[in-house]
């Protein structure tokens, strides 16, 4: 498994914990909103910043997509 994928799994699990939600449900939501790949591709930025900042960014990404739907 690549470092990028390991971090993505870690991020997904920590984000789900932060949201008091199941990781499977979070991933399904991201897939539905078509943001999973975008979040995965943000590895370079996300792995060097505070995890809370990453969570806030993911919240914004999801909110923007929900507004468009």
Can you name each region flagged by the protein language model?
Residues 11-12, 27, 33-34, 60, ...:
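Generic detector of leucine side chains in alpha-helical contexts
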């Amino acid at each position: 498994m690549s470092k990028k994928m390991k971090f993505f799994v870690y991020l997904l699990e920590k984000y789900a914990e932060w949201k008091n939600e199941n990781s499977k449900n979070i991933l399904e939501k991201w897939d539905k909103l078509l943001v999973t790949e975008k979040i995965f591709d943000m590895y370079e930025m996300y792995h060097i910043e505070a995890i809370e900042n990453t969570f806030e960014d993911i919240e914004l990404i999801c909110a923007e997509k929900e507004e468009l739907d």
